[in-house]
Amino acid sequence: MNICIVVGARPNFVKAAPIIRAVQAARQKGEIINGELVFAGYEDDKSIEPSLFDDLMMPHPDTYLGADSDNLNELTGMVMSKFEQYLDQHPTDVVIVVDDLASTMAASIVAKKRGLLLAHLVAGTRSFDITMPKEVNRLVIDGLSDLLFTAGVSGNSTATREGAGQEKIYMVGNILIDSLRHNRQRMVRPADVIPVRRSSARTRARSSIMPKGFDI
């Protein structure tokens, strides 16, 4: 099975990391599964610091589509064209899109037009404000998806109310927690990095707000 995970912005990598690790773990157990990470943007995207992938303990994207535009409709068209080219060169069985960006909506449309199995991570999220571009993206992606991975009961309820069958809905929980747990042992408390004498700090804070001549 060949899986393609599509992300469109920096925050999406935090949610994609647990999926990448799950694919790697399955391969180590002997399962025939391959996973590729596709980023809609450029390799030198300024919003992505060099340490991000090391911090998340995940590999860098396998492919950068290089799509970028301030116009969301133009960006959608660019991603559709570039993702189509990617799929022409990379046999894919399942496409997993993360979140609700224009780029992930574009990838969803291409995947379904090619008859691929489509899964949406963080499905069922709604603002109920159709004037928001992301709300349009959510409706399109969820409507096209074969599998809806929701974060909680509210997501399940939304998907059901909009006509999704129970066989499509999987409540996977808040996947950000998976990343948090995975990195828990590596976390350092601020107090361990910058020692602070709490009593003196508290005294200085109090003295800064006391009237002159007031004895503390």
Predicted regions: what they are:
Residues 30, 35, 118, 169:
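Hydrophobic anchor at the start of a short beta-strand
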Residues 4-6, 14-22, 28, 52, ...:
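Active-site and donor-binding regions of nucleotide-sugar-utilizing enzymes
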Residues 35-42:
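Short internal beta-strands
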Residues 42-59:
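N-terminal beta-loop-helix "entrance" segment that forms/cooperates
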Residues 3-5, 35, 95, 198-200, ...:
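Conserved hydrophobic helix-helix packing surfaces used for dimerization/oligomerization
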Residues 12-16, 45-47:
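Short N-terminal binding/cap micro-motifs at the start of the first secondary-structure element
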Residues 42-43, 47, 66, 144-216:
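A nucleotide-sugar donor-handling region in carbohydrate enzymes
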